[in-house]
A protein has these predicted regions:
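Acidic/histidine-rich catalytic neighborhood
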Residues: 139, 143-215
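C-terminal beta-sandwich/jelly-roll accessory domains of carbohydrate-active enzymes
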Residues: 401-445
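Long, K/E/R/D-enriched contiguous segments that form extended
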Residues: 9-37, 41-44
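Surface beta-strand/loop "capping" patches
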Residues: 371-412
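Extended, hydrophobic/aromatic-rich amphipathic alpha-helical segments that build helical scaffolds
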Residues: 1-5, 109-117, 135, 139-144, ...
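Gly/Pro-rich turn-and-neighbor structural signature
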Residues: 1-16, 30, 54, 221
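Active-site core of glycosidic bond-cleaving carbohydrate-active enzymes
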Residues: 33-73, 77-83, 89-126, 131, ...
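Short, solvent-exposed turn/loop segments enriched in Gly/Ser/Thr/Pro and often Arg
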Residues: 6-20, 60, 73-77, 186-187
Length: 445
């Protein structure tokens, strides 16, 4: 489906894609950038379809001038001294003509920047990084350099719904250090208060700054600026564990045991990589609890909620839970023709579940490769060929009795890589890339 709707030189896939059959389609068949259009491309790189990802990157580059004009015309984004903000961001709803619709999604451009970076991370295309990716990422960083808000000790200056926090709420801010940086007046899509330091925003900005710093150092550019950005990264308000052991969605510890469809505060688990079982086990356990709270009933039962939960459970090493999400999508939100339904019909579920399943099979976000990091009891044996890992490495492997039995790695240039297989670390040398290896992966049995 992605091959059919997203090629170099074309527009990216949108909500209903080429399969829209409405004169007035739901949500105008647009690009919703608070999850939907990004989800459509979660499988592009790991499923070895990098060329399909180019359509999204090129679209972001093409609409940047209009977004820049709109962002700089918005006086609400002005700097403290009244000057227009540098850089740009986006409104939630965009269309094929570059128009911006429903309300500002202030961290939306930062989410686009992750896709821009990931295309480099998987392909290793240095020319792309220098000429296209880095300039876009740097300008999006400029927006946040100008837009971030500095809090005083104990959260002085913090606002929730435009007002000072209550005395009870202030207790949750007591540990905030002077100089802490927060995204002002944010929103955890699509519920809760308008508030400073919403975790979804904080996580996106941290991902943006971190990846842009890496890009600058790879290219040997802007050393002083990258160092300054690193200083801001360290000052960002970070993830917090709440009173019940949950990963907080806001700096104020609300307990939203809700079936809300968005899992925005878990961005740091996936598609971000700030939280993992190996690097941050306490935060990972808190994220696990928060994911359990969201559940899979009511509002959580949507075409695109299942893929995100699939990927989240996979990143947390819970293969059987991830498999439950795959089955949930098929049972509750898939039409007889195999297209997914929100309802109504939307393509993001079809696209996104590919990315989720890829995360169950191979992960490469933590600095090495992890082969079948989330084994599934319902998949006792099987094989897959042609998956892609970061660093432009192609992966073939098979498994039997729930254990990986054979792994082959391919790359254009020989590499020795840290690889985790069946829970144990080893080092493997890549084989020469064979003709045809970079074709689309075969489905796992």
């Amino acid at each position: 489906l992605l091959l059919s709707s997203s090629r170099p030189g074309t527009l990216p896939a949108n909500l209903q894609g080429l399969w829209n059959d409405y004169v007035k389609p739901p949500w105008a068949c647009d690009y919703h950038n608070n999850i939907n259009v990004q989800m459509a491309y979660w499988g592009a790189e790991p499923a070895n379809l990098s060329e399909c990802h180019e359509a999204l990157v090129n679209y972001v580059e093409a609409m940047a001038p209009g977004c820049r004009d709109a962002s700089q015309a918005n006086k609400g984004f002005n700097t403290k001294d009244g000057k227009p903000v540098r850089g740009w961001t986006v409104r939630t709803s965009q269309n094929i003509f570059g128009g911006n619709g429903w309300q500002w999604n202030i961290p939306g451009a930062a989410w686009y920047a992750l896709h821009i970076w990931e295309h480099y991370a998987f392909t290793g295309d240095r020319k792309y990084l220098e000429k296209q990716a880095y300039p876009l990422m740097k300008e999006i960083c400029h927006f946040w350099e100008d837009h971030l808000k500095e809090l005083g000790a104990g959260g002085e200056g913090f606002k929730t719904n435009g007002k000072d926090p209550s005395e009870e709420e202030k207790k949750d801010l007591a540990d905030v250090k002077a100089g802490t940086l927060v995204a002002p007046n944010g929103w955890s899509p699509e519920h809760g208060p308008r508030e400073d330091g919403v975790m979804h925003d904080q996580q996106l900005i941290a991902e943006l700054f971190s990846n842009t710093i890496k890009a600058a150092r790879i290219l040997g550019k802007d050393a002083a600026w990258a160092k300054s950005l690193e200083g801001k990264l360290k000052r960002l308000a970070g993830n917090k564990i709440g009173k019940e052991g949950n990963l907080q969605e806001w700096m104020i510890d609300r307990i939203p045991k809700t079936d809300h469809r968005h899992t925005s505060h878990l961005f740091a688990v996936f598609p971000g990589n700030q939280i993992s079982k190996l690097k941050t086990p306490k935060l990972a356990e808190a994220a696990r609890l928060s994911l359990e709270w969201r559940g899979t009933t009511g509002d959580s039962r949507r075409s695109w909620t299942w893929p995100w939960r699939t990927a989240l459970w996979a990143r947390l090493g819970e293969g059987n839970k991830a498999h439950e999400m795959v089955q949930g999508l098929l049972k509750f939100n898939t039409l007889p023709n195999m297209l997914t339904t929100h309802p109504p019909m939307q393509m993001d579920g079809n696209f996104g579940i590919v990315g989720g399943i890829c995360e169950m099979l191979v992960q490469s976000h933590a600095g090495g490769l992890d082969i079948m990091p989330s084994p599934v009891e319902a998949w006792p044996e099987g094989s897959v060929k042609g998956l892609k890992a970061r660093g432009n490495v192609t992966v073939d492997f098979s498994w039997k009795d729930g254990k990986v039995s054979n792994v082959k790695l391919y790359s254009a240039q020989p590499k020795v890589l840290p690889v985790r297989v069946n829970g144990k670390m080893t080092r493997m040398k890549t084989l020469p890339l064979k003709s045809g290896t970079e074709s689309s992966p075969s489905a796992a049995r």
